[in-house]
Amino acid sequence: MEHARRIGLPVAFVRMLSESAFFNRATPFVRWIDGFEPHRNEMIFERSSPSCYACEPFSALMNQSRGGIVLAGFAGESSCLSTLIDAFHRNHKVTYLCDASASHALEEVPADEIHRTVSKISGLYGDVHETDDWIASTLPRKLGIGKNAGG
């Protein structure tokens, strides 16, 4: 997130809010994760279903956007995957940062195994990168000097 802020990419936060026992305003589940709170100038969206596209203002923003989004978060097996699939069906470009996301365990399958699988499936719907690789791909490039520099 710090890299995105540093290079001037807009940062948005999306959280689940509903009338359920877990995702209503009175529970700790709707709080931001410590160290990952929005800054005053950043967008906040609230949704009632797993996909970010369940939030009409988010969906409208994506429909007007020319670029794609970089997606990271919790939970990979529900929110991230459903957002990737919705984006794919709308021809929106998504880059999923698999190591900046996490998934829940499902029954007897451990969380890390679920997350590895989600990360592989995500590649069907968007680009999947580790954070360091994505950062390196978005750093400003310096023009080379010498015989192999081109020009």
Regions found by a protein language model. Give the residues of each.
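A short, N-terminal amphipathic alpha-helix
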Residues: 1-10
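Active-site-adjacent betaalpha module
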Residues: 6-7, 19-151
